């Protein structure tokens, strides 16, 4: 058997673009015959797949798998090079099979996935064979799984175009409430897919971030007010400049002060004290809404619900708690969008041809 040197492996790798170990194995199987090794790699699709690996895969699909008992929800993103392949039935099946494999084997990382076994072969080899068949570079970019704790429940949603997927987990105070909450969680996932909140609640916001955003908000509103004053349109009154941007800033002392101010106004208006309890909650809600505009933009709980824009997600959950007879606390959500954070590689036809010559 011919000796397989590092120089031979390097030459084959540069010629075919295949991986180092694939080149070494091909040379071993062909007794060092370079041309036969090239042909073997082509027959296996390994050279073709590896050669494509420098092409950015920024299209693709997001897939969601929710276990039958609603205790585990997995979301994954697998990228392709073109939107055309993302609509390919074989690629769609690949994304579903991979997501189910991730969930059933409790995999935690892409590295762990590649070293796992699927259908009797290493996943890395399985993916290479799919690349060779489909004809484009495919990349498992990321995945995540949420688990339900005791009396917990999970659910998920995949948007019809397959480009946005969401999974969510909630903690409840009984299995009965958890079971009743399944549909609610799916609907909240739909809301997340549409509104893309960045945070779960105002409690997750950093105070320095909030303070900086407040300055930006005031500057934006003042600029709009300046334009409205110029136009003098009676249908577009000036914005009221809020004192705060988030409930993160509304301490107990601030809320108490606001309530006392409302009482003073009611007294000045001559409203009898016996009806104050009916008026104050609504005015306090208005005060909080006016001073938490950042929450309504960035946080799930503070956003107005897409299925009922008169209520926030937090208010909808509170109503369901009364209906179901128990507590429902959203613990975590994860939203993936295809290509999020990736920069698509664009070339004109002439440049693409030149790059291949």
UniProtKB/Swiss-Prot annotation:
A cellular component term, taken from the record's GO annotations: cytoplasm
Domain of life of the organism encoding this protein: Bacteria
Residues covered by region (Involved in Mg(2+) ion dislocation from EF-Tu): 82-85
Location(s) in or outside the cell: Cytoplasm
Keywords recorded for this protein, A-Z: Cytoplasm, Elongation factor, Protein biosynthesis
Pfam families xrefs: EF_TS (PF00889)
Main localization (coarse): cytoplasm
Role according to the record: Associates with the EF-Tu.GDP complex and induces the exchange of GDP to GTP. It remains bound to the aminoacyl-tRNA.EF-Tu.GTP complex up to the GTP hydrolysis stage on the ribosome.
NCBIfam families xref list: tsf
Annotated family: Belongs to the EF-Ts family.
Protein name from the UniProt record: Elongation factor Ts
Species of provenance: Campylobacter jejuni (strain RM1221)
Name of encoding gene: tsf
């Amino acid at each position: 058997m011919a000796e397989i040197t590092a120089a031979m492996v390097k030459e084959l790798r540069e010629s075919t673009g295949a991986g180092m170990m694939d080149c070494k194995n091909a040379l071993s199987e062909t007794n060092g015959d370079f041309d036969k090794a090239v042909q073997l790699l082509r027959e296996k699709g390994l050279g073709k797949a590896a050669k494509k690996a420098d092409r950015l895969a920024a299209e693709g699909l997001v897939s969601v798998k929710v276990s039958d008992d609603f205790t585990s929800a997995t979301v994954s993103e697998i990228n392709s090079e073109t939107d055309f392949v993302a609509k390919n039935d074989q690629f769609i099946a690949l994304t579903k099979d991979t997501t189910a494999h991730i969930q059933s084997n409790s995999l935690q990382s892409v590295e762990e996935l590649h070293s796992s076994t699927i259908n009797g072969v290493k996943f890395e080899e399985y993916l290479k064979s799919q690349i060779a068949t489909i004809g484009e570079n495919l990349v498992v970019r990321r995945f995540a799984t949420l688990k339900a704790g005791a009396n917990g429940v999970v659910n998920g949603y995949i948007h019809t175009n397959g480009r946005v997927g969401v999974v969510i987990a909630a903690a409840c105070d009984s299995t009965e409430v958890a079971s009743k909450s399944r549909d609610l969680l799916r609907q909240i996932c739909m809301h997340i897919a549409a509104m893309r909140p960045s945070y779960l609640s105002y409690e997750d916001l950093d105070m320095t971030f909030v303070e900086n955003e407040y300055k930006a908000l005031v500057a934006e509103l003042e600029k709009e007010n300046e334009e409205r004053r110029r136009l003098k349109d009676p249908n577009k009154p000036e914005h009221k400049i809020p004192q705060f941007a988030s409930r993160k800033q509304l301490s107990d002392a601030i809320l108490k002060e606001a309530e006392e101010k409302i009482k003073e106004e009611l007294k000045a208006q001559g409203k009898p004290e016996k009806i104050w309890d009916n008026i104050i909650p609504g005015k306090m809600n208005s005060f909080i809404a006016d001073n938490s505009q950042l929450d309504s933009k960035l946080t799930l709980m503070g956003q107005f619900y897409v299925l009922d824009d008169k209520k926030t997600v937090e208010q909808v959950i509170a109503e369901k708690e009364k209906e179901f007879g128990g507590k429902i606390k959203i613990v975590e959500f994860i939203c993936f969008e295809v290509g999020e954070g990736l920069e698509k590689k664009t070339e004109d036809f002439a440049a693409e041809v030149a790059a291949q010559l």
